[in-house]
Amino acid sequence: MRYMRNFLFLVLLVSLLSACSKQPASQITAEKPTVMFNAFAILRQDADRYLQSNPVLSISAQEVYDKAIVAADSKYYLVDIRSDEHYAKHHIPGSIHISYADAWRNNKTDFLPKDKKIIIIDYSGHSSSQVAAFWSLLGLEAVPMKHGMAGWSKDKEVVGGSPMPCEARNFPVVKEETAGKTYDLPRLENKTTRAAELLRQRGEAIAAKPVVIQADELMAKVNAKNVFLLDIRAVEHFKAGHISGALNIPLRGLAEESNLTKLPPDQPIVVVDYDGHAASQAARLLNLLGYDSVALRDGMSVWTGDMNVIGANAVSCAIPERSTAQLNAPANPGPSTAAT
């Protein structure tokens, strides 16, 4: 009887093992879940590292002319990001062309030299400032030319857009500070932790976003109390006068986590600085981090003519004329999205 029980037990065991072996593999081994990472933390560290390095925020058209054109200094590498049409009509001699909408693409940026100072040229300096921030995060030494082609020439045909404004709007400023709030940080779920790949993905996602807001449009939003204002100037200049309702976070500390919690992730943010260049870089960094931001075109220098409030010179259209080259056809056809 005992042997019979053992025999029956062995038969049952073999039957069970045989049944298990016939189960589909998917029932035996569960699929591994896709691991997602918070890209925000990775990109924030890169943005903070960049701002803490005290980057050069712009280079004057005069320096570009003196060094790159007159002295033919080979360390300067000029990239024009305006439209194909405007580049073809007039551009600074020696500059190559990459359209603004293509500035995030590997096949446009991988060949750029890492041992030269890349000067980025657009219409007014704002789009080039955004691209400069992006390319700097990729490891390039990139600097926008101040005021773009509008700082090179007063001729609208040469610029391809509006020339420099000749005077400030003289809109009101206040000294009272607005109490801030605390917000959750954005989350950017992604499968990769590679910073360069994350930058490319975010660059593509925000390529078509507006770059600037005009002072008149911003004034209307301020009057309607329908805007979140971020002033990134130095504390002393902010205290001397700022746009009503603005929150002050100086540029260098903008990407610190404690400061980013002061910004709403679900509300448009207008970034204000001295002349629009630093604000444009800040706006690009914030957009990469998942915020929705634009820069005030020409910054406080067009909002008010009071240099004590601005912390810098007011806008001026008094610039010398400089040479340009012409082409019969675009050197590098690109998409229609234009720089500003």
Name what the model sees in each region.
Residues 121-122, 272:
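Short, surface-exposed ligand- or partner-binding patches at beta-edge/loop junctions that are enriched
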Residues 8-16:
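Bacterial N-terminal signal peptides
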Residues 82, 124, 233, 275, ...:
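Residue-level signal for short, function-critical loop segments
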Residues 64, 77-82, 95-98, 218, ...:
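Short hydrophobic beta-strand that contains or immediately precedes a catalytic carboxylate
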Residues 20-59, 70, 88-117, 126-212, ...:
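Rhodanese-like catalytic fold shared by cysteine-dependent sulfurtransferases
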Residues 28-37, 72-87, 226-238:
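Short, compositionally biased "basic patch" segments
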Residues 1-8:
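Bacterial N-terminal signal peptides that target proteins for export
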